[in-house]
């Protein structure tokens, strides 16, 4: 989830546990709710030390405990009179909330690293969801603005209402994920991808072996079933070597491996491609169907010369509407 949502939910849970009466420990919990994402500062070291990657060791029980211990030691120096044990408790809770929220999405986190590589990902929400981001920004404004401008009783009511709203949202997402999981098995798919709308999901099945790859997916709407035609795409190994390239399928076959080599991240997500004709041949858009943000998807644009087979590759964010893929909007 986005950083604002992590901090706000950790804040509200700390608020609920203290009944809104201990600002120091509420602040400690909300700070800890955001600290695991400080691993973004360690990215230059991640190539040498993989545990320092984003969603690595800082997103584990060990990592958040280290943060909590540090807060318990430094906290009383910053806020005289603060109880170190309570600081430890609320910072541990805030950090664990961060892990659980990330695992609730289609990102994966290693809660038991470095002792185990087992990952947690429930695929119940998007990692970056415009709905929750808007909720969090609004919540942040209300909590900060009202703190010193309205009576304390009104501020407490706002806090409780926001806490109930967020918990209700998470319950809605969890129940929807359970329902769509049953439909996934019924329809013969192997995975689900959440969209921004908790009632719309993608059902996915992917196969990859000996250089060949294929995927199929369809949009599922809770209460209505599969509402769009299934989309499918596949690549054989080895790709065709004949020139000139005359069909869209040949363009897909030839561009697949260069595109995946250009973006290892794209190669590790569920992906799809669309093909359009161009002046010299074909333009192929390979993009992720798993990580879409505000109607755009990251991917690789491949301009393929039909006569020579030469390719020009460029990273970009594509508007899904431009790619004529209404399934993914």
Please report, for each region that a protein language model flagged, where it lies by residue.
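C-terminal regulatory/interaction regions
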Residues: 175-329
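N-terminal membrane-targeting hydrophobic helices
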Residues: 1-216, 221-233, 324-328
């Amino acid at each position: 989830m986005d950083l604002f949502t992590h901090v706000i939910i950790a804040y509200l849970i700390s608020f609920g546990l203290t009944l809104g009466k201990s600002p120091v420990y509420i602040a400690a919990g909300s700070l800890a709710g955001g600290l695991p994402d400080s691993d973004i500062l360690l990215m230059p070291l991640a190539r040498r030390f993989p545990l320092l990657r984003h969603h690595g060791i800082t997103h584990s029980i060990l990592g958040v405990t280290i943060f909590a211990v540090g807060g318990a030691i430094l906290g009383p120096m910053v806020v005289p009179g603060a109880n170190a044990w309570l600081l430890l408790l609320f910072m541990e809770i805030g950090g664990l909330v961060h892990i659980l929220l990330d695992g609730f999405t289609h990102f994966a986190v290693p809660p038991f690293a470095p002792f185990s590589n087992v990952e947690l990902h429930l695929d119940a929400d998007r990692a970056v969801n415009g709905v929750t981001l808007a909720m969090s920004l609004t919540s942040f404004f209300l909590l900060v603005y009202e703190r010193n401008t309205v009576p304390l009783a009104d501020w407490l009511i706002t806090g409780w209402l926001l806490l109930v709203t967020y918990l209700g949202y998470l319950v809605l997402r969890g129940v929807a994920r359970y329902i769509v999981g049953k439909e996934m098995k019924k329809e013969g798919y192997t995975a689900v991808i959440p969209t921004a709308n908790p009632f719309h999901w993608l059902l996915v099945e992917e196969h990859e072996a000996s250089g060949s790859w294929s995927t199929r997916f369809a949009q599922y709407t809770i209460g209505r079933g599969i509402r769009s035609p299934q989309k499918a795409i596949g690549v054989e190994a080895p790709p065709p070597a004949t020139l000139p390239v005359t069909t869209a399928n040949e363009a897909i076959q030839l561009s697949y491996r260069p595109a995946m080599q250009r973006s290892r991240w794209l190669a590790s997500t569920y992906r799809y491609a669309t093909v359009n004709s161009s002046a010299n041949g074909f333009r192929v858009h390979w993009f992720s169907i798993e990580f879409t943000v505000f109607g755009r998807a990251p991917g690789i644009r491949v301009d393929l010369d039909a006569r020579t087979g030469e390719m020009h590759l460029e990273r970009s964010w594509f508007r899904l509407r431009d790619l004529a893929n209404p399934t993914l909007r």
